Amino acid sequence: MIQMQTNLDVADNSGARRVMCIKVLGGSKRKYAHVGDIIVVSVKEAIPRGRVKKGDVMKAVVVRTAKDIRRVDGSVIRFDRNAAVLINNKRAQSWDQTIALSIARRNEGYTHSQHSNQREGGERIQAQPSPPHARRAVKTSFCR
């Protein structure tokens, strides 16, 4: 669960290393964000020649949380740290980003087309289980 003042790691190559949540989007009374939710963040730490600078305010999609994620089959997914991917105001990335992450929720609509669990015709693809330590570098655009 991500709330205001939560520090998150950045899981892309935008140049930001650490961000802080300043608002959870989705209603005036909404307190917590989970995997797949959009939040407003402030960049707290960035590399010197990155695309973003310290103090920039951007939107981000939460991709990993330390809170348990329960799946319908009864399995539980948990990460060591909270992480997010920076996006622009139109819910798409403003540049090509390489993201190293394990996809925690495939049904949120924020996964790359080659990693989604549904084909164009609507038939479901049987997802192959991957070990929890497996990480993939994915070139994506986060559009619904």
UniProtKB/Swiss-Prot annotation:
Molecular function in Gene Ontology: large ribosomal subunit rRNA binding; structural constituent of ribosome
GO biological process terms on file: translation
Region (Disordered), start-end ranges: 107-144
Keywords tagged on the record: Ribonucleoprotein, Ribosomal protein, RNA-binding, rRNA-binding
CDD domains recorded: Ribosomal_uL14
Gene3D superfamilies: Ribosomal protein L14
SUPFAM superfamilies hit by this protein: Ribosomal protein L14
UniProt cross-references to InterPro entries, sorted A to Z: Ribosomal_uL14, Ribosomal_uL14_bac-type, Ribosomal_uL14_CS, Ribosomal_uL14_sf
Pfam families tied to this protein: Ribosomal_L14
Signal peptide from the UniProt entry: none
GO CC list: cytosolic large ribosomal subunit
Family of this protein: Belongs to the universal ribosomal protein uL14 family.
Chain's role: Binds to 23S rRNA. Forms part of two intersubunit bridges in the 70S ribosome.
Subunit structure, interactors included: Part of the 50S ribosomal subunit. Forms a cluster with proteins L3 and L19. In the 70S ribosome, L14 and L19 interact and together make contacts with the 16S rRNA in bridges B5 and B8.
Protein name: Large ribosomal subunit protein uL14
Gene name of this polypeptide: rplN
